[in-house]
């Protein structure tokens, strides 16, 4: 194996580990959401996340937390609160694989928001593919089916919130340290969650607390794994592997919750995945032309 292939293989390996961690997050969130309210899950998740990040703040020094954009951090925290509580609630009522497929639609929402907030010019082919992708999203949600649950729309609210976070990150991440972005987001989200969590409070068991701690730590772990992956391979090279998360989620959901993806979820995935892949590669092509 030559050095280039070895580096590529290791980079993809790091990326696959991030997918496993992401799927594990959904599984833990679903399990916790069966008893604890999503507000309480969000509170503990980001409370523990801020605790885990404290040693890094101490190590890199207080200057790491200096920011000239406190309102941006507050906005990110609010979006994280809406996104994560909606996502956790959605997981409590829907299969994990459905959530995974809907998460693939986030780039579609990001593309639309980029037009309004980043003044990006979008070629007509990407608009067509985006519309096709949303058709896949509608198929996954099954709004006209007799067994349609309107609460599934919480996933859509979460996807929009995460897309807005992507827009903010694109605009400000180069102007803020990674530690400050993570720490302030965790603190703000935890604080915002307190009133809502208190209203639906159920004292977690020791096992639930352990899962909540792992959930709070995993956000930083996923970021670490992604940074390791992207230090070895181009982000675009990892795009096709992103959709292996559906396989990982399906296996985990089957053995833990006895869930199996229904036809609508699979049909939606067949449409959404090519659409988002086209958007990712066309964005890469557009960026290379600018360079």
UniProtKB/Swiss-Prot annotation:
Record bears the keyword Transmembrane: yes
Keywords: Amino-acid transport, Cell inner membrane, Cell membrane, Membrane, Repeat, Transmembrane, Transmembrane helix, Transport
Superkingdom of the organism of origin: Bacteria
Compartmental location: Cell inner membrane
Biological processes annotated in GO: amino acid transport
Pfam families to which the protein is assigned, alphabetical: EamA (PF00892)
Residue stretches in coiled coil: none
Gene Ontology annotations for the cellular component aspect, listed alphabetically: plasma membrane
Record has Membrane as a keyword: yes
Cited InterPro entries: EamA_dom
Record-annotated EamA domain positions: 21-141, 160-280
Membrane topology reported for the UniProt record: Multi-pass membrane protein
Transmembrane segments: 4-24, 41-61, 74-91, 98-118, 121-141, 148-168, 178-198, 206-226, 237-257, 260-280
Known function: Transports S-adenosylmethionine.
Protein family per UniProt: Belongs to the drug/metabolite transporter (DMT) superfamily. 10 TMS drug/metabolite exporter (DME) (TC 2.A.7.3) family.
PANTHER family assigned: ACYL-MALONYL CONDENSING ENZYME-RELATED, SOLUTE CARRIER FAMILY 35 MEMBER G1
Protein name: S-adenosylmethionine uptake transporter
Organism annotation: Rickettsia bellii (strain RML369-C)
Gene name of this polypeptide: sam
């Amino acid at each position: 194996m030559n050095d280039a292939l070895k580096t590529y293989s290791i980079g993809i390996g790091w990326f696959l580990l991030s997918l496993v961690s992401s799927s594990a997050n959904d599984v833990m969130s679903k399990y916790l959401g069966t008893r604890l309210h999503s507000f309480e899950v969000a509170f503990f998740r980001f409370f523990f996340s801020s605790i885990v990040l404290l040693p890094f703040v101490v190590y890199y020094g207080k200057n790491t937390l200096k920011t000239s954009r406190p309102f941006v951090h507050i906005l990110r925290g609010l979006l994280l609160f809406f996104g994560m509580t909606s996502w956790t609630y959605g997981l409590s009522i829907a299969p994990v694989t459905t959530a995974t497929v809907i998460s693939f639609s986030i780039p579609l929402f990001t593309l639309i928001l980029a037009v309004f907030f980043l003044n990006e010019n979008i070629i007509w082919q990407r608009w067509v593919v985006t519309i096709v992708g949303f058709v896949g999203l509608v198929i996954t949600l099954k709004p006209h089916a007799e067994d349609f649950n309107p609460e599934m729309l919480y996933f859509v609210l979460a996807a929009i919130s995460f897309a807005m976070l992507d827009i903010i990150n694109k605009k400000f991440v180069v102007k803020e340290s990674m530690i400050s972005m993570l720490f302030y987001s965790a603190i703000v989200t935890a604080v915002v969650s307190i009133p809502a969590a208190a209203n639906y409070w159920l004292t977690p068991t020791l096992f639930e607390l352990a899962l909540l701690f792992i959930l709070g730590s995993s956000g930083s772990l996923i970021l670490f794994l992604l940074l390791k992956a992207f230090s070895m391979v181009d982000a675009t090279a990892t795009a096709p592997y992103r959709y292996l998360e559906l396989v990982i989620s399906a296996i985990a959901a089957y053995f833990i919750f006895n869930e199996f993806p229904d036809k609508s979820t699979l049909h939606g995935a067949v449409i959404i995945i090519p659409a988002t892949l086209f958007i990712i590669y066309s964005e890469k092509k557009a960026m290379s032309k600018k360079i």
